[in-house]
């Protein structure tokens, strides 16, 4: 997005990490700002959006993309871990999208809110009940906000990828192997890629290209869930 001329705000719980990304962009002559944001903290979310408005004066596109993964067998799932998952993947999405909606509505120009769903917005997976719960809800929230936002020119979308080999997913491989009593190779082949048609991971670039495409949408796709799943979850 920055390469295409957008001013980018990098918001993360890890401020040092956000600053490193923003510096990489500004060193390349692009426009970026880093802010600390715990998406499950209402005051931090609002403060982060206020900082963005002070710096750039508008809120045109927001992608709600914070995430964490904690896996356990369902009957052993600690309630504290459930609450943490829901706080980030459901409450956090609500707080970020509401903050964006408020500012887009107030501007009179509208904007685009992009939610991060998952293939697990549509299919169930072992050991991930709270993740399934939240990601299904994210897709539903996008549809509801699309209805309410239309009159203000606010469009919403949910990008739903299958597994991407990020550090978060890399961490899951040994955890699932341990909990399921199988090898790491079996986790990749028989769980993560089993239901794709080509045995291929989705990539970060797939998501970035879809985000850029949606930044130019004029409402034809509002409310839709875009499935980047290599055929795993076909509409």
Region annotations inferred by a language model:
Residues 102, 147-151:
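Alpha-helical segment proximal to the catalytic Tyr-Lys
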Residues 97, 134, 142:
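Active-site helix of classical SDR
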């Amino acid at each position: 997005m920055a390469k295409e001329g957008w001013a980018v705000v990098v918001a993360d719980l890890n401020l040092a990490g956000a600053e490193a990304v923003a510096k990489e962009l500004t060193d390349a002559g692009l426009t970026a700002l880093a802010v600390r944001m715990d998406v499950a903290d209402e005051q931090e979310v609002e403060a982060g959006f206020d900082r963005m408005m002070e710096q750039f004066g508008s809120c045109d596109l927001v992608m709600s993309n914070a995430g964490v993964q904690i896996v356990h067998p369902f009957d052993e799932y600690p309630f504290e871990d459930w609450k943490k998952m829901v706080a980030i993947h459901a409450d956090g999405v609500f707080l970020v999208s509401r903050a964006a909606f408020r500012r887009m509505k107030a501007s009179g120009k509208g904007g685009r809110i992009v939610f991060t769903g998952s293939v697990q917005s549509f299919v169930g997976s072992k050991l991930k009940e709270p993740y399934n719960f939240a990601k299904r809800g994210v897709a539903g929230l996008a549809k509801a906000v699309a209805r309410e936002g239309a009159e203000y020119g606010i469009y919403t979308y949910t990008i739903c990828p299958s597994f991407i080999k990020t550090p978060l997913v890399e961490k899951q491989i040994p955890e699932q192997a341990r909990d399921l009593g199988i090898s790491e190779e079996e986790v990749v082949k028989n769980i993560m890629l089993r239901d794709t048609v080509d045995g291929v991971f989705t990539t970060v670039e797939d998501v970035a290209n879809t985000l850029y495409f949606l930044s130019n949408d004029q409402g034809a796709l509002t409310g839709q869930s875009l499935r980047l799943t290599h055929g795993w979850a076909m509409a």
